Protein backbone atom coordinates (compact mmCIF):
# COMPACT_ATOMS: atom_id res chain seq x y z
CA UNK A 1 0.00 0.00 0.00
CA UNK A 2 1.20 3.50 -0.86
CA UNK A 3 0.00 6.95 0.21
CA UNK A 4 0.18 10.11 -1.89
CA UNK A 5 0.21 13.13 0.41
CA UNK A 6 -0.48 16.56 -1.05
CA UNK A 7 -0.08 19.60 1.21
CA UNK A 8 -2.25 22.68 0.71
CA UNK A 9 -2.20 26.16 2.28
CA UNK A 10 -5.18 28.51 2.33
CA UNK A 11 -8.59 27.71 0.96
CA UNK A 12 -11.84 27.11 2.77
CA UNK A 13 -12.29 23.81 4.64
CA UNK A 14 -16.08 24.03 4.89
CA UNK A 15 -16.61 24.95 1.23
CA UNK A 16 -14.18 22.20 0.19
CA UNK A 17 -16.03 19.59 2.25
CA UNK A 18 -19.39 20.73 0.90
CA UNK A 19 -18.19 20.85 -2.71
CA UNK A 20 -16.61 17.40 -2.43
CA UNK A 21 -19.80 15.85 -1.01
CA UNK A 22 -22.01 17.43 -3.67
CA UNK A 23 -19.77 16.52 -6.59
CA UNK A 24 -19.18 12.94 -5.43
CA UNK A 25 -22.93 12.35 -4.87
CA UNK A 26 -23.84 13.78 -8.27
CA UNK A 27 -21.13 11.73 -10.00
CA UNK A 28 -19.57 14.94 -11.31
CA UNK A 29 -16.25 14.24 -9.58
CA UNK A 30 -14.61 10.88 -10.17
CA UNK A 31 -11.62 9.83 -8.07
CA UNK A 32 -8.48 8.65 -9.85
CA UNK A 33 -8.54 5.04 -10.98
CA UNK A 34 -7.00 2.72 -8.41
CA UNK A 35 -7.54 5.02 -5.43
CA UNK A 36 -8.68 2.84 -2.52
CA UNK A 37 -9.56 5.58 -0.05
CA UNK A 38 -8.77 9.17 0.80
CA UNK A 39 -8.78 11.45 3.79
CA UNK A 40 -8.16 15.12 4.44
CA UNK A 41 -6.44 16.29 7.61
CA UNK A 42 -6.95 19.97 8.44
CA UNK A 43 -5.16 22.34 10.80
CA UNK A 44 -7.49 25.32 11.22
CA UNK A 45 -4.87 27.32 13.13
CA UNK A 46 -2.40 27.33 10.24
CA UNK A 47 -5.05 26.93 7.48
CA UNK A 48 -3.14 23.95 6.06
CA UNK A 49 -4.48 20.60 4.86
CA UNK A 50 -3.06 17.23 3.95
CA UNK A 51 -4.91 15.28 1.27
CA UNK A 52 -3.94 11.61 1.64
CA UNK A 53 -4.88 9.14 -1.09
CA UNK A 54 -4.16 5.42 -0.78
CA UNK A 55 -3.25 3.09 -3.65
CA UNK A 56 -2.04 -0.50 -3.93
CA UNK A 57 1.09 0.43 -5.92
CA UNK A 58 3.41 3.28 -6.79
CA UNK A 59 2.56 2.68 -10.46
CA UNK A 60 -1.11 3.41 -9.75
CA UNK A 61 -0.14 6.71 -8.13
CA UNK A 62 1.99 7.63 -11.14
CA UNK A 63 -0.89 6.74 -13.49
CA UNK A 64 -3.29 8.88 -11.43
CA UNK A 65 -1.16 12.03 -11.65
CA UNK A 66 -3.04 13.46 -14.63
CA UNK A 67 -6.40 12.99 -12.88
CA UNK A 68 -5.09 14.72 -9.75
CA UNK A 69 -4.07 17.68 -11.93
CA UNK A 70 -7.56 17.76 -13.48
CA UNK A 71 -9.14 17.68 -10.04
CA UNK A 72 -7.02 20.68 -9.06
CA UNK A 73 -8.32 22.54 -12.11
CA UNK A 74 -11.93 21.64 -11.24
CA UNK A 75 -11.78 23.15 -7.74
CA UNK A 76 -11.12 26.90 -7.47
CA UNK A 77 -7.91 27.79 -5.63
CA UNK A 78 -9.79 29.98 -3.13
CA UNK A 79 -11.59 26.78 -2.06
CA UNK A 80 -8.87 24.09 -2.37
CA UNK A 81 -5.92 26.28 -1.41
CA UNK A 82 -2.48 26.36 -2.99
CA UNK A 83 -0.70 23.02 -3.30
CA UNK A 84 2.76 23.36 -1.76
CA UNK A 85 4.06 19.80 -1.97
CA UNK A 86 3.32 16.23 -3.04
CA UNK A 87 5.07 13.24 -1.49
CA UNK A 88 4.61 9.48 -1.79
CA UNK A 89 5.20 7.05 1.07
CA UNK A 90 4.96 3.31 1.37
CA UNK A 91 2.59 2.37 4.19
CA UNK A 92 4.83 0.46 6.60
CA UNK A 93 1.95 -0.76 8.77
CA UNK A 94 -1.58 0.12 9.82
CA UNK A 95 -3.50 -0.70 12.99
CA UNK A 96 -7.26 -0.49 13.24
CA UNK A 97 -8.21 -0.42 16.90
Residue ranges and their predicted role:
Residues 1-50, 56-70, 77-97:
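Short S/T/G/P-rich N-terminal loop/turn motif that feeds into the first structured element of a domain
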Amino acid sequence: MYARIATFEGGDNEKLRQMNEERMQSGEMQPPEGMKRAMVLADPDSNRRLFIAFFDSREQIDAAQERFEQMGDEIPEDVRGRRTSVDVYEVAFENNV
